[in-house]
Swiss-Prot record:
Keywords: Toxin-antitoxin system
Naturally occurring in which organism (per UniProt): Mycobacterium tuberculosis (strain ATCC 25618 / H37Rv)
Name of protein: Antitoxin VapB46
Record's function text: Antitoxin component of a type II toxin-antitoxin (TA) system. Upon expression in M.smegmatis neutralizes the effect of cognate toxin VapC46.
Keyword Membrane: no
InterPro entries on file: Antitoxin_Phd/YefM, phD-YefM_TA_antitoxins, YefM-like_sf
A GO MF label: toxin sequestering activity
Assigned protein family: Belongs to the phD/YefM antitoxin family.
Length: 102
C-alpha cells in the first residue's frame, strides 16, 4: 500500500481518490458499519464519507434540539383571529401582486 492510497490518521481513515475508485465497495461497507472516511486529492482533504444520520429530518431536528414536540393537540388550538374590516389576507395580497407581474 502506498502512503497516498490509504492511511489511518487518529481514528479516521484517509483515502485518496484513486483508492476510493479501486475499493469503493469495501469502503462503503465500512461506512455502513459506522466509520467515517476522509477522501483526499493529492494529499489534500476534499470530502468526508460518513454514514447517514438515523431517522428523517423531523427526528434529526428533534435530536439536535432545534425543534420541540408539540404540547397541544390540534383540536385544542384557539380559533383564528378575525381580521379588522378592510384588512387583506397576506395570500390575497401576494396573489394581487403576482397578477401585475404577468
Amino acid at each position: 500500500m502506498t502512503p497516498t492510497a490509504c492511511a489511518t490518521v487518529s481514528t479516521m481513515t484517509s483515502v485518496g481518490v484513486r483508492a476510493l475508485r479501486q475499493r469503493a465497495s469495501e469502503l462503503l461497507r465500512r461506512v455502513e458499519a459506522g466509520e467515517t472516511i476522509e477522501i483526499t486529492d493529492r494529499g489534500r482533504p476534499v470530502a468526508l464519507l460518513s454514514p447517514l444520520p438515523q431517522g428523517g429530518p423531523y427526528e434529526q431536528l428533534l435530536a439536535s434540539g432545534e425543534i420541540e414536540r408539540a404540547t397541544l393537540d390540534v383540536v385544542d388550538l384557539p380559533e383564528p383571529l378575525d381580521l379588522d374590516a378592510g384588512v387583506e389576507l397576506p395570500s390575497v395580497t401576494l396573489a394581487r401582486l403576482r397578477e401585475h407581474e404577468r
